[in-house]
């Protein structure tokens, strides 16, 4: 039964690749300036280069990957071009950071999620607006949009001035199990990509959003290197599984626990 599902996913993804082969993050297309108002870029006070992405979920909170944690994080909102900033672009620093575990431990398949409270809230503007948490998990075969300022070539790194976007698909978890050794039987992650290769998130895209049918479903966590290999889809933290923890933390319950 698993083999049948995997083969069915391969057919779906091959058809998607044939239809959308020009849309790549690795060597791919610039995002529309109006489609990523919730996308934020993370950098540190020591380096101006964006090293991770994140997602604005309300005027005061940003969601990203736990492995994107650094000292002296700076959060850039309302950005498109780094060289020519939008007039409404803003910079914030985190007031608080929240992790699933107090030890900040996470694995490639578990709890790679970090919630940051901004020191000062932001207002909606032309290029800044939050995205809602998902009301339901995505289904296998869903077309999703991945985006970020990560490298557009791999293994050599080429960082773009503007965010790049690509359409990828939700796959059965078993596809990622077959592609990446060591994954457990179940995990709170999503498997997403194009089995034929060419479309993928990459270094610098970590922590950024996976948007499926208009809903924020995933956080870019990890994948193969070089990026964009055939039969090597990416792994994304499954946001839906953490919505209760996120909402409880935002409501002030700092003792909220993540799902086991």
Swiss-Prot record:
Top-level enzyme category: hydrolase
Glycosylation sites: 123-124
Peptidase S1 domain location: 25-251
Family annotation (InterPro entries): Peptidase_S1_PA (IPR009003), Peptidase_S1_PA_chymotrypsin (IPR043504), Peptidase_S1A (IPR001314), Trypsin_dom (IPR001254), TRYPSIN_HIS (IPR018114), TRYPSIN_SER (IPR033116)
Cross-referenced CDD domains: Tryp_SPc
Disulfide bonds: 31-165, 52-68, 100-258, 144-212, 176-191, 202-227
Gene3D superfamilies membership: Trypsin-like serine proteases
Compartment list: Secreted
Protein name per its UniProtKB record: Snake venom serine protease gussurobin
Primary residence: secreted
GO biological process, alphabetically ordered: proteolysis
Residue numbers covered by the propeptide annotation in the UniProt entry: 19-24
Signal peptide segment: 1-18
Similarity comment: Belongs to the peptidase S1 family. Snake venom subfamily.
PROSITE patterns in alphabetical order: TRYPSIN_DOM (PS50240), TRYPSIN_HIS (PS00134), TRYPSIN_SER (PS00135)
Catalytic site positions: 67 (charge relay system), 112 (charge relay system), 206 (charge relay system)
Entry GO MF terms: serine-type endopeptidase activity; toxin activity
Keywords for this protein: Disulfide bond, Glycoprotein, Hemostasis impairing toxin, Hydrolase, Protease, Secreted, Serine protease, Signal, Toxin, Zymogen
EC number, UniProt record: 3.4.21.-
Subunit comment: Monomer.
Its biological purpose: Snake venom serine protease that may act in the hemostasis system of the prey.
Keyword Protease: yes
Tissue expression summary: Expressed by the venom gland.
GO cellular component, one term: extracellular region
């Amino acid at each position: 039964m698993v083999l049948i599902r995997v083969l069915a996913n391969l057919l779906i993804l091959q058809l998607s690749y044939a239809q959308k082969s020009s849309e790549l993050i690795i060597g791919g297309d610039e995002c529309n300036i109006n489609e990523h108002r919730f996308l934020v870029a993370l950098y540190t006070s020591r380096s101006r280069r964006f090293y991770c992405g994140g997602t604005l979920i309300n005027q005061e909170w940003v969601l990203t990957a736990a492995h994107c944690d650094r000292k002296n994080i700076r959060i850039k909102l309302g950005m498109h071009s780094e060289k020519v900033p939008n007039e409404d672009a803003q910079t914030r620093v985190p007031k608080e950071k929240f992790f699933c575990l107090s030890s900040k431990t996470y694995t490639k398949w578990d709890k790679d999620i970090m919630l940051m409270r901004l020191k000062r809230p932001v207002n909606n503007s032309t290029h800044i607006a939050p995205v809602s948490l998902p009301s339901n998990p995505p289904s296998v075969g869903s077309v999703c949009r991945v985006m970020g300022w990560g490298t557009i070539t791999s293994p050599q790194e080429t960082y773009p001035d503007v965010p790049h976007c690509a359409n990828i698909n939700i796959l059965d978890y078993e596809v990622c199990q077959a592609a990446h050794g060591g994954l457990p039987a179940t995990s709170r992650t999503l498997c997403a990509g194009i089995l034929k290769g060419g479309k993928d998130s990459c270094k610098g895209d970590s922590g950024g959003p996976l948007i499926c049918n208009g809903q924020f479903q995933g956080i870019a966590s990890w994948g193969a290197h070089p990026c964009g290999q055939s039969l090597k889809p990416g792994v994304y933290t499954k946001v839906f599984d953490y919505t209760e923890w996120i909402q409880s933390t935002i409501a002030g319950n700092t003792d909220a626990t993540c799902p086991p």
